[in-house]
Regions:
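Conserved alpha/beta-hydrolase catalytic His-Asp/Glu region
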Residues: 7-61
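Flexible "cap/lid" loop of the alpha/beta hydrolase fold
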Residues: 1-4
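Conserved alpha/beta-hydrolase "acid-adjacent" motif
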Residues: 78-84
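Short beta-strand/loop motif that positions the catalytic acidic residue
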Residues: 65, 71-73, 77
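Hydrophobic "lid"/C-terminal helical patch
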Residues: 12, 50, 88, 115, ...
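Active-site acidic short loop of glycosyltransferases
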Residues: 66-67, 94
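Residue-level signal for the nucleotide or nucleotide-sugar donor/cofactor binding architecture
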Residues: 41, 80, 110
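Catalytic active-site module of serine/aspartate enzymes centered on a nucleophile-bearing elbow/loop
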Residues: 94-128
Length: 128
């Protein structure tokens, strides 16, 4: 079943953003407009991505990661809830976890200045 682009745009908005963004009528109109222009299409690449996604518990494998890691969770993410990011960070020895408020699944677009500052601070702490 192929749903209308306008329906898909509204659904994507609800699953992607925080209540704070969703309460801003101007932001909602802009994002719906953008999602209407760029609808999700079931391309071969997207289908392969879905098939390649790991289905099992990967946490035991994460315990062998030795590279410094920053896991960022978005507080209002309904697609990948922040507790799952925390679980990943807890599984990686020495990993840092940061939860960013007022952000949904696309938190890096909602609050890019906060996300970018966190990533830059992490890199700086590593000497980069």
């Amino acid at each position: 079943v192929q749903l209308p682009v306008s329906y898909d745009a509204k659904f994507r908005l609800l699953e992607s953003f925080s209540p704070k963004t969703l309460s801003n009528d101007e932001a909602v109109a802009e994002w719906i407009g953008m999602f209407n222009i760029w609808p999700i299409k079931l391309t071969p690449g997207l289908i392969c991505q879905g098939k390649a996604s790991p289905q099992g518990n990967r946490l035991p494998v994460y315990r062998s990661i030795t590279t410094p890691v920053l896991v960022i969770g978005f507080a209002d993410d309904v697609v990948t809830p922040p507790h799952l990011g925390k679980e990943v960070a807890d599984a990686i020895p020495g990993a840092q976890y940061l939860q960013i408020a007022d952000t949904g699944h696309l938190g890096f677009l909602e609050r890019p200045e906060v996300v970018n500052a966190a990533v830059l601070k992490f890199f700086a702490s590593m000497g980069y």
